[in-house]
Amino acid sequence: KPIIYYPLDAWFIKTTAVKDRMVELNKTINWKPASTGTGRFGNWLENMVDWNLSRSRFWGTPLPIWKTEDGEEEICIGSVEELNNEIKKAAEVLGGETNKHYLHEGILDLHKPYVDEITLVSDSGKPMKRVADLIDVWFDSGAMPYAQWHFPFENVETFAKSYPADFIAEGVDQTRGWFYTLHALGSLLKESVEEKLKEKGLTTQVFNLKKY
């Protein structure tokens, strides 16, 4: 069977906008061995492209963006509380059976297909449906330090005690995976260079391959 290449619309995080910051912050990380930080990871940062965030799959974290059919209006939801408020708002404005199953307890399962049953309403009164895409699973991994404590919605003090990490150990292959997404999200979410992601110690495992 032939391999077919065709263009698709996608959502991106403009990581190139903070490239210089990420490069500088990388120099504050205590890499072991140091050559991983200056070489493999440093080179990856120097040649980074914008992060393709969206995926065309069924299983995963849905992209929390709703759009009108004409694509002129959209909303990005930032929390479960905001989503449930928008669910009720849409039911009041659009009427009928809009979101009838989610008006009392709110939405309990944020995954497909349930989240795609939700209709929201735009500022001009038009119905909005969620875009079909999911979020890159590496975003979930990079968001782990925040998500595990439901930060910033609660556990702020607990989060402050454990972030940033004192020590992270993973395989060298994670320079393009988990290490990168941790570094990218940490750089994007903090407001000043001094508050950016600064792991106090980070080491990589070396894979030894043996022929049997």
List each model region and its residues.
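Structured secondary-structure scaffolds
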Residues: 1-212
